[in-house]
Amino acid sequence: MKKTIILALVLAFVLTGLGLGQAQKPSDIKFPSLTYNPPDPAAFKTPFANGLRGYVQEDRTLPLINISAHINFGGLYLSKDKQGLDTLMSGTLIQGGTKTKEGPAIQERLDFLGGSLSFNVAERTSTLTLSVLSKDLDEGLTLFFDVLMNPEFREGPLNLAKARVLQQLRQANDQPSGVLSREYEKVLYGDHPLTWQPTKATYDGITGADLKAVHAKYFFPKNIILSAAGDFAKADLKAKIDKFVAPWKNKDLALPAFSKAFHSPEPGVYFIQMPTNQGYIDIGHLGLEDTNPDYYAVQIMNFILGGGSFSSRITSKVRSTEGLSYNQGSRFTYRWGFPGVFSGYVQTKSSTVGYAISLIQDEFNRIRKEPVGDAELETAIAYYLESFANSFESAQGTMSSFANLEMTGKPMTYYKTYRDKIRAVTKAKVQEVANKYVHPDKAVIMIVGDWDPSNKGGDKWPGPLDKLGKVHKLSLADPLTGEIGK
């Protein structure tokens, strides 16, 4: 009897699986088209008192509120002798307390509320972010604006921050990947605020008065954009924030102007000796700004070349076919107001350093000379179209994105037109931008690794490395002093 029941169940399962019209393979499955319209920044733009700008969205999903202040100040705005002040400000704006509260007291109160307050300084923007339960909004805003408007940068917390960053500075040359990133940009950008590095002397010379002076110069309502999302009534939040910022004084500020006249480094191999059994490699040159009209076609081109994980050409050749690496590809980085960097990259054992580089260079030349395939183009475009909605997964993330658009001067129609510009990319356009922005003959090949086995090569690509171009052996600076070793 039991066997009969089991047989009947199995037969029913099989017959169900053979139902008419069922897809026989995944590619046969048809999904309804996804229709998604991105939110319009204008619907969330909120002017506050005293020229403070903002983007605000009510989100009643959870009893939480997130608020960020995006300040037009970053490490690039510092003089050469004040390098590191941005890092110290990151570590002391909150911890250094305010005129009326010690840093530990602020943190203890946030812990009691189950909230958080964080601050970060990047190249050209700084961000102070508050997260609290909606029932604690009033106290959270009081702490948030007290820190934003009245930081004290007390000596004790400042000295602790200096001790932490000096320990990190001592370790700056320990990791090959960190050395590669830093030294590669130095070669590409030259002597420029983008590549200036702090030393022990610059850290030691920074005082609480210096931090207060920078705060006074850059932190005022018209130089800040707020983003906020959470469980609140928009009109109520606006009224509360207006009370905090109404007495805050504005000022005239001329932001620093930066040169875009970068030097042209000599193409070739730039080698940094480190006792490691792998070579850490970047191959490339300066790229473009993300305000360039070619940005969209470059994104598609790079996805095909090396940015598309396992579907990309570099990964397929270097990893899947040759088995040389688990970390390889290509990238275009972007920075506000400057050309970013184009790089092919790979980590591979010392004996295959030259071979891996030659394979990546082959792919650089191939994408310039040959039109990409129909399937490659379709896959790349589909990736950007299908992942587009991910940019708006969280309400606070969306508001912050809108604040960033305004801060960097991008058109507020950026998201509205994004997919149409991606769809418009053609095979001919991909080849055009490949020839315009990928230049193997101008590439800097930066290698961090062990010279002897890397230079010797292996069976498929015997050395020496000067077959790839003129070799420049670089010495690292002592991170504490900035002095170049011999």
Put a short name on every predicted segment.
Residues 24-31, 225-289, 449-486:
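An aromatic/glycine/proline-enriched structural segment found at the starts
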Residues 164-182, 260, 264-279, 316-325, ...:
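Short acidic/His-enriched helical or mixed secondary-structure segments at domain edges of catalytic enzymes
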